[in-house]
């Protein structure tokens, strides 16, 4: 029984050390995209399309966790109504970035 417990603890330490060295999962929620027009009923789809067209780091294997669309009213740089998308995404921390 003593050796079994020691073996389990040893495996746990290997697992923990491997994740610390590789960096684990990195989660980022500050990717903002702005665009023309309002969000409307399919605002989430607009944000998802914009995210995949304008990825934060094209070389990474990313997992999109979700996007939220917000109307931004009239803004001078868009010459009319605009929207803003806020997206959360994650990637494995052992990339070369």
From Swiss-Prot:
PANTHER family referenced in this protein's UniProt entry, alphabetically: DEFENSIN-LIKE PROTEIN 241-RELATED (PTHR34450:SF6), DEFENSIN-LIKE PROTEIN 245-RELATED (PTHR34450)
A single GO BP: signal transduction
Assigned protein family: Belongs to the DEFL family.
Name by which UniProt lists this protein: Putative defensin-like protein 240
Record flagged with keyword Signal: yes
InterPro entries (UniProt xref): SCRL
Localization in the cell: Secreted
Source taxon at top rank: Eukaryota
Upper taxonomic lineage: Eukaryota, Viridiplantae, Streptophyta, Embryophyta, Tracheophyta
Any one GO CC term of the record: extracellular region
Disulphide bridges, residue numbers: 29-88, 39-69, 47-85, 67-87
Record has ATP-binding as a keyword: no
Chief localization: secreted
Signal peptide residue numbers: 1-23
Native source species: Arabidopsis thaliana
Keywords per UniProt: Antimicrobial, Disulfide bond, Fungicide, Plant defense, Secreted, Signal
